[in-house]
Structures are given as C-alpha cells and as structure tokens.
Amino acid sequence: MPKYRSATTTHGRNMAGARALWRATGVKDEDFGKPIIAVVNSFTQFVPGHVHLKDLGQLVAREIEAAGGIAKEFNTIAVDDGIAMGHGGMLYSLPSRELIADSVEYMVNAHCADAMVCISNCDKITPGMLMASMRLNIPVIFVSGGPMEAGKTKLSDQIIKLDLVDAMIQGADPKVSDEQSEQIERSACPTCGSCSGMFTANSMNCLTEALGLSQPGNGSLLATHADRKQLFISAGQRIVELTKRYYEQDDESALPRNIATKAAFENAMALDIAMGGSTNTVLHLLAAAQEGEVDFDMTDIDRMSRMVPHLCKVAPSTQKYHMEDVHRAGGVVGILGELNRAGLLHNQSKTVLGLTWEEQLAQYDIMLTDSEEVKRFYRAGPAGIRTTQAFSQDCRWDTLDDDRAQGCIRTKENAFSQDGGLAVLKGNIALDGCIVKTAGVDESILKFTGPAVVFESQEDAVEGILGGKVKAGDVVVIRYEGPKGGPGMQEMLYPTTYLKSMGLGKACALLTDGRFSGGTSGLSIGHASPEAANGGAIGLVKQGDLIAIDIPNRTISLQVSDQEMAERRAEQDALGWKPVSRQREVSFALKAYASMATSADKGAVRDKSKLEG
C-alpha cells in the first residue's frame, strides 16, 4: 500500500517544525493525515484566457476540503502568445512551458503534495502542467478556464463571426479602412477565455479530455457559461476520490501514467487529426509522452495521419464554426464518438471518471445518450455580452447540432476530407520530418513547387513580405527560428497573416524550423527537423532553389543534387550553423534554454544526454 507523500512532512516528532508551519497556513489537528492536494492555478491579468481564474482555485479548494482533503493553492506563470507575438517577447513563449513544468515539480515535491488539480487554459500552460503531471505521476485532474465566445460584427449587412486572427489580417491589409479594421479589432475578442477557434489553447484542452485526464466538456464549454462551474466543483470532488483510490486502496489505475497510456496518446492524436488542431499540439504531445516514458513519437503521428479523416472543421480553417459550435455538436465526446464508430478509437482506455471510453461515450455522446441532462449541457451557448467574468450567463441553443452529414462534426462517410487535418512530411530538407495543418490548406495547393525566398529571421520575413519581395508561386523559407536557433522556436503567425493580407494566402508556401500559432492556416509547414542550428538541411537552402511539396504523398524535397548538398554542408560546417547578420538580443535565460533544446521532432524538450555522466 503506498504511503501518503505528505506524511513525510506531517508525521513524527522530527517534523514538528513542518507541522508548525502547516498550522500557520490553517491546518488543524484533525487535518493531519488527510491527503494534501495541490491546486495548481495559473491566474494572471495579462491573459484573457486566465483573467477569470482568480477565485476558481478557491472554488476547487473548498470542494477538496469538503470531500476530506487539505487543499493548498499556488500559481504558475502564463504567457499570452498573442500579446507576445511579433516582437522579442515570442522568444519566451515555448521556453515558458519548461519553466511551468519545473515550477509545478518544484512546488509539489518540495511540499510533498499527494495529488493535483491543474487549472490551465492557454497555449503553454496546459502543456507545461501536462508534462509535470506525467513526470510526477501522482493523481491529477485538469480543468481549464474554457474558450472565449466568438466575436461578432456586422459587415455588408451580414453578421459574421470573428476571432483574433481576423483582427490581425484586417489590421495588416492596406485595402481595409481604418474604420473597418478598428470595428473588427473591437469585436474579435469579446469575453474572457481562450481564443475562440481551434487554436493551440483549445486544441490542448480538448486533448486532455481525449487523454482521459479531464471531464466531459472541458475542451469546449464556454468560459462564460454557468455550467462550467460544475466542472470545477466536480474536479475538487473527484480528485479526492482518485487520491484515496491510489493511496488507500492501492489502485494504480488512478495514476496519470496508467490513464494517459500509449493508447490514450493515440486517442488524443486521432482527435487532433480529426479536428484539425494546432500543429503545436504535436510538440506538446511528444514532450508529455517523453515525460511519462510513453513510447509515442513522430512515427506514430505519421501512421495515424494516414488513417484518420478530418471530421470537424473549426476556425481558423473556416469562419463558420468556432468552439461554441463544437460544444453544441457534442464537444470532444462527439468527435471521439464518430472516431469510435469508424473503428479509430481505443475505447477500452480509461478516464478520470473511472470509466472506459466505451462506457463514457454511452453516457455522454449526444448521438447515443437518452439523458436530457447531458443534452441540455451540450446546448450551453454564448450570450454575446462583453465580460471578463466566469460563469456569468446561462444561455442555451434551442437545439443540438446532431447533423453528422453537414454539421460541425461529421461521420467518417461525410468527412470534410478523408485525409486528416494534420500531416507529417519528410524529405531531404527535413529528414526527421515537418508538420503541416492540412485542414487549413486549400485543395488547389496540396501539391506545390516553387522557388525559395530565404529569410534568416521572422523579422526579415515580415519586412520582405510587406515590402513586396515575395510573389505568387514562391516558397518562403524562414530558418534559424527553431528551439535552439531562435532560441525559443517563435510562432510565425505574422508572416502567414501578412501573406494573406497581401493576397498570397493561396498562392505561396511557407517552410520554417520555427512553429505556427494555432491561428495559422494556408500551406504553412513548420517544425522542420533537424533545425538549421542543429545542422538541418533547411540551413542549406539558397535563394531560388526549387522546393517541391506533395502533401498527398507526404513528401517535401529540395530540388538540389546530393553532390551539391554535400558541398554546401561542408561549406556550412566551416562557417558554423548560425544566421547571417541577424541582430537579436538573447538573454542569459534564453541562452540557457537553447543550450539544452532538442529539435521539434523530439518535442523541443531538453536534451537529457547533456545531464548524464
């Protein structure tokens, strides 16, 4: 029978000092012996996805204590990628994932906590907490802050839905008037919550459901909706049940590594491909798998990308559907239900509810259940009122979207495409692979060949695109922006956005060893591995070289002979693998990150071999 970790600090005369300090935090005599459960919050006033979380940690804490635990809350940092984007701040985004994972480990291990509730939401916070959960392997439940309502505005006598990316595109389009640009800016992000499309934050919150580590609705139920309060209440109650199952009943099925198994990671990846999730999720799933010693890598992702169809199309791949529409169609459970009916789900994997996915689908899939309570839950909708308050409205759709032929979520037979929403491409320019969000690629450019226009940084690329150096038919190459080369693997949302604003969104390709925002669409290929700074062939591309992209056949190649490539490599070895004449201030903290960073095909995690021996 495992011993409560917290007993180290709460039992024995030699722990009198620790107990004295616990008492000073409010622990009473009768509490010693109860499980100590960390409430890992991420409240900050910098991020709309986290601005409403301040009181939610204590909401969870009260439920933990009512159920027989001791709740202790702490906070992690949280970077807003949208605000950090387009300047030096973006260098810090991906490295913050490692800091979050480490800070959770530090706090939980330093104080011998027995279990965790992770209150996450935005881009690097959920992955960082997920990495920590797999690393620590103590009972955990995730509950996110929830998605933002979609923005709405009236243009040309039509009400259209909006999100952050619309504001960015319109702001950079010289043909759009200042008045219209400001109108869209003011309407794009109306409430608290993670940005309203299937961007990185919402993708990751959906994936925690598929991994089995969060409750139904976690990925899709709006931040503003009153129903979301119950997810926080239930998380506080369930974590005590999970904790006692493990420590008092020796039930190891309550541990995250026994919930988020390889089968669960494959379920999460199947969901990601089916819903056309952010390419960043590939990085984060690979990183979390390594933390949990799960045998899941790019080979698995490539295999699955060839099997799973695109069943759910959401912004930025369409303007028609946002996260509120996904929820109305049954949320993550609805998509997993269709994957199950297509034979593409490991339905015996378990979840934090203690159910197999087969059992959970029977209860929560709107296409199967008879429960009016469940159907009412999935009719939770937007109010259209600007607010930063959680649980502030109780609006509902009149009907569910159960149209699996032409609705937001579709059957395999009626899929948006039989080819999934993400693909792994390989070739001489990316021997270890690169990633493209096929859900956002127009069918006319699934095969594309063009001359390279090479930039050594995102800043130069932005200047070049806006300055007219890129024309229709070109392949924009942005290199030395990987985890080590950036450092920090910046998101390339501004270059892709400006290509659209210049009318080149369907006429150009972009290849980078950096990454993309979940808001990116178009023929945008990222994570080229190895990255240029690690000797990757993307560092050998010269201006005008032809690059051939073939998504259906999963290939990408530099049309240069092997002999020429070898000569260029020898030349680059002598010069050193670094950008030419790039002016960029890199802090000591970022240099420390770069010194241990691996390429994207490894999840951009730290190179553990550098700590051995």
Swiss-Prot record:
<dbReference type="InterPro" id="IPR000581">
    <property type="entry name" value="ILV_EDD_N"/>
</dbReference>
<comment type="pathway">
    <text>Amino-acid biosynthesis; L-isoleucine biosynthesis; L-isoleucine from 2-oxobutanoate: step 3/4.</text>
</comment>
<dbReference type="GO" id="GO:0009099">
    <property type="term" value="P:L-valine biosynthetic process"/>
</dbReference>
<keyword id="KW-0100">Branched-chain amino acid biosynthesis</keyword>
<comment type="similarity">
    <text>Belongs to the IlvD/Edd family.</text>
</comment>
<keyword id="KW-0411">Iron-sulfur</keyword>
<keyword id="KW-0460">Magnesium</keyword>
<dbReference type="InterPro" id="IPR056740">
    <property type="entry name" value="ILV_EDD_C"/>
</dbReference>
<protein>
    <recommendedName>
        <fullName>Dihydroxy-acid dehydratase</fullName>
        <ecNumber>4.2.1.9</ecNumber>
    </recommendedName>
</protein>
<dbReference type="GO" id="GO:0005829">
    <property type="term" value="C:cytosol"/>
</dbReference>
<feature type="binding site">
    <location>
        <position position="122"/>
    </location>
    <ligand>
        <name>[2Fe-2S] cluster</name>
    </ligand>
</feature>
<dbReference type="InterPro" id="IPR004404">
    <property type="entry name" value="DihydroxyA_deHydtase"/>
</dbReference>
<keyword id="KW-0479">Metal-binding</keyword>
<dbReference type="GO" id="GO:0000287">
    <property type="term" value="F:magnesium ion binding"/>
</dbReference>
<feature type="binding site">
    <location>
        <position position="123"/>
    </location>
    <ligand>
        <name>Mg(2+)</name>
    </ligand>
</feature>
<feature type="active site" description="Proton acceptor">
    <location>
        <position position="517"/>
    </location>
</feature>
<feature type="binding site">
    <location>
        <position position="195"/>
    </location>
    <ligand>
        <name>[2Fe-2S] cluster</name>
    </ligand>
</feature>
<feature type="binding site">
    <location>
        <position position="491"/>
    </location>
    <ligand>
        <name>Mg(2+)</name>
    </ligand>
</feature>
<dbReference type="Pfam" id="PF24877">
    <property type="entry name" value="ILV_EDD_C"/>
</dbReference>
<comment type="function">
    <text>Functions in the biosynthesis of branched-chain amino acids. Catalyzes the dehydration of (2R,3R)-2,3-dihydroxy-3-methylpentanoate (2,3-dihydroxy-3-methylvalerate) into 2-oxo-3-methylpentanoate (2-oxo-3-methylvalerate) and of (2R)-2,3-dihydroxy-3-methylbutanoate (2,3-dihydroxyisovalerate) into 2-oxo-3-methylbutanoate (2-oxoisovalerate), the penultimate precursor to L-isoleucine and L-valine, respectively.</text>
</comment>
<comment type="subunit">
    <text>Homodimer.</text>
</comment>
<dbReference type="InterPro" id="IPR020558">
    <property type="entry name" value="DiOHA_6PGluconate_deHydtase_CS"/>
</dbReference>
<keyword id="KW-0028">Amino-acid biosynthesis</keyword>
<dbReference type="InterPro" id="IPR042096">
    <property type="entry name" value="Dihydro-acid_dehy_C"/>
</dbReference>
<feature type="binding site" description="via carbamate group">
    <location>
        <position position="124"/>
    </location>
    <ligand>
        <name>Mg(2+)</name>
    </ligand>
</feature>
<dbReference type="Pfam" id="PF00920">
    <property type="entry name" value="ILVD_EDD_N"/>
</dbReference>
<dbReference type="GO" id="GO:0051537">
    <property type="term" value="F:2 iron, 2 sulfur cluster binding"/>
</dbReference>
<feature type="binding site">
    <location>
        <position position="81"/>
    </location>
    <ligand>
        <name>Mg(2+)</name>
    </ligand>
</feature>
<dbReference type="GO" id="GO:0004160">
    <property type="term" value="F:dihydroxy-acid dehydratase activity"/>
</dbReference>
<keyword id="KW-0001">2Fe-2S</keyword>
<keyword id="KW-0408">Iron</keyword>
<dbReference type="InterPro" id="IPR037237">
    <property type="entry name" value="IlvD/EDD_N"/>
</dbReference>
<dbReference type="GO" id="GO:0009097">
    <property type="term" value="P:isoleucine biosynthetic process"/>
</dbReference>
<keyword id="KW-0456">Lyase</keyword>
<feature type="modified residue" description="N6-carboxylysine">
    <location>
        <position position="124"/>
    </location>
</feature>
<comment type="pathway">
    <text>Amino-acid biosynthesis; L-valine biosynthesis; L-valine from pyruvate: step 3/4.</text>
</comment>
